[in-house]
Amino acid sequence: MLALTSATGKLGSAVLNAILDNKLIDPKELTSSDPSSERFSSLRAQSITLRQANFDDPSSLASAYKGCTSLFLVSTPRIEMDYNNAPLWHGREAHHRAAIDAALQAGVQHIYYTSLGFANPSKAGVMRAHIRTEAYLADLAKEGKCTYTVLREGLYNESWPLYFGYYFGLKEETRKEVIVAGDGNVSWTSIPDMAFGTAKVLAAPREQWAGKTFYLSQKKTHSLSDIARIVSKVRGEEVKLKVVSRKEYEDYYVNEKGMERPSVEWWSSTYDALKDGECEIDDGTLEALLKEAGRAPKPLEETVEEMLR
């Protein structure tokens, strides 16, 4: 049986939907760790086991994973744990380790972990917890305690506003100039496409992907400058991209936009990674999985237009 975590989150819920919509895994072979969500009322009728699990309560994790042979571990969204250069086992990797240790205690043999579409090593602070988790899984595998698969999920099409100067106002935005701390090509990938690829991996015999680390990302790239042009076209007015130093970027969003400094400083390192080409992914795994199903990756332009309409 496969245990799914974070099944109400953006990626986790999309993966669950892909599994069910495409009938990739019998619902009786699934367990999810968030029984309180209203969205699961219909899933109970499909015999999916729902159990309570809390990263801060190891005993609840072990109970949730009992009887499962595999775990799909989606990284925790508690990014504030990573702020201020959190030392080892004090960042988000602490939650990941708690889940992994509980899974092994419960008898889980294989762990699928959702990492992120940056390099390893990486200059991006957002990647630190992922790198630490990947290393922990590798150590456990060397000790013969489990097998694992690392899926480095591409940067979401839907997350472009975060990289594009916190452009969360979307169609309500009035800025004619967007300040960032760097630019580079990114292999943006839609959540539904990644979810489908992930679901296909989860449904395959685990030996097929065991011990592998790979990216689930489309190959076509767009820079933030490209996004500025797309946004300008959709809005019918020019929106310029302005690249400044990390310090200028941090001061601007803290002093002018009222954002929390630890958050902005943590995120600003992402632009060093973009400049180094870390997010320009040359891995055909996802496109091959989509092609087998007669699908093609959703273009970034389409996502941006949908979000701005």
PLM feature spans:
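Oxidoreductase cofactor-interface core, primarily capturing Rossmann-like NAD(P)-dependent enzymes
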Residues: L2-D26, L30-T31, P35-F40, D56-S59, ...
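CheY-like receiver
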Residues: S63-A64, A102, Y136
